Amino acid sequence: ASDITEFQESLQDIHAPGLNIMYGDKEGNIAWWATAKLYQMPDSAQTKLIMDGSNGAYEPLRFLEFSENPSAVNPPWNYVYSANNQPDSIAGMQYPGYYLPENRAKRIVELLDGIDDWDKNAMMIMITDATSLVNVEISRNLTKLVNVKKLSEDDINLLDKLSAWDGDAHLKSVEATVFHRWIYFFLKNTFEDELGPELFQQFLTTHFHKRLIAPMAQKKESVWWDNALTEETIENKKDIVLSSFVMALESLKEELGESSSKWTWDKVHTLEHGHPIGQVDMFRSFFNVGPFPVDGTREVINNMFFTYTADGQNKVSSGPSTRRIVDFSDIENSVSILPTGQSGNPFSPY
């Protein structure tokens, strides 16, 4: 393609998988397109569930034209982005999809709206940002429900720190450590009694559980609050929130000691780049890169994903595959680096 028009025309041939395509050129054009062969389903179709395909009642009504796909071409707000989040409604409806939560998208918009004179250095800081505004909202929604009469003075101090937390998951953050341990037990105490241990662990590997943490933290009434295993007691949200907080603290005390000042994020959030040969213990230190303590967390711009587990060891399993900043005013000023840097060259000073 020689220009944005030719580039856009070529995208309509992408049917699957669905991709977010970002565009920029030296003429100053910017664009984002959601590319896939989308279709319209009957209003009665519950697309999140398995449907009866035998009677034809849930067949797609039509395939959409590519022009109906979500997109933004040279928008008036002067930037485009994607964090695999749910796009705004198109033609009065939202398109269903397997989206990630809005955490990263909200932070991207906040940062981009706050600065007009972006340069390479500012962008380098942005792409390693580890703050989640959504986690701040979740933390405040949960902390206000905790019955402090049942906590020690030290526990109350921790609760106060969480209620004032700015959502930054830096290496020395105690709040990030407590928050994620609390969320694990919050999910466990809410869903495991109905799902069972095996299905609950599968549930923790889905995008769906990421998208419901914030709504459940805000939701007052739910059938999920009651523990199905306690027939004589009907638990409410406050019971689940308090018991989860207490269990999180007990878990951290057992793992990291009684002093909460030592519960820093670098103790529980690590990254190791594995090599096939490094799976053998005796070769691990020679072939693997790491493990290292690493800042960032799930669903922030510096997206270091880990699956919640009972042992609380938040081992990063995925993250940015590359970091790249292209300066169209000076292409030679662009930078790019892989996650493992120069580690494949043992003689490199880097």
Q: Residue locations for each model-derived region?
A:
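C-terminal/peripheral segments of proteins
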Residues: 1-151, 157-160, 164-350
